[in-house]
Amino acid sequence: MCFDQRRVACREWASADGGSGVATCAGPVANGNPVDTTMLGAHTFTVDAADNLGHTANQSVSYTVAYNICALYDQTRAHRSGSTVPIKLQLCDSAGANHSAAAIVVNATGLTQQDGTASDGVEDSGDANPDDNFRYDEELEGYIFNLSTDGLTTGTWVLSFTVTGDPIPHTVQFDVR
C-alpha cells in the first residue's frame, strides 16, 4: 500500500476467536482512525490480540508514505524533437500543499518511451542541471529540469526521478512530435 503524504488513511481491524473469546485487541490507533501518513517512508501497522486463555497473535500490514508530484507544465503538449522541455514540478501532499524545499534533491534517473520501445539517457540542455539534478527555483517554489529532446523519436516519453527521503520512484511525461 502506498499513500500520498498527509492523506487521511483509515484502517479498520478486528480480532476474532472461535474458542474462549477475545480478551484484548489493540492497534497503534483506535479502530477506524487514521494511520500516520505525515512521515515519508516505509511503515508497519500491527494489531495485537489475546484470547481469554492467554494465547496471543498479531497481524502486520506494511504501507509506504510518499510525495505526490504536482506537475507545473502541460504533460500532453507536444514538443519538437531537438527542443528543450522545461520539466517543472512541486512535491505535494495529498491535499496539493507544496512541500518543495531547496534542501530536498530531485534527481532524474531515466527516460523511457511510454510504449516501451525505446529508452535513452537523461540529457539536460546546457549546464543548468548538473549531475541530472533538478534545480530548485525559489520563485516557482519548485523544481526545474531543462530536458533536451535531441534524438528522441515521436511519442510519449516518461522521465523517472527520485526524491531525497522518498522511497518511491516517481515519473512525469511529455510528448515529442
Regions found by a protein language model. Name each.
Residues 3-15, 45, 86-88:
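A short beta-strand segment in extracellular, disulfide-stabilized domains
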Residues 1-2, 18-63, 153:
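Serine/threonine-rich, repeat-prone extracellular segments and beta-strand-based repeat modules
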Residues 1-5, 24-27, 64-177:
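Contiguous segments within soluble domain cores/interaction surfaces
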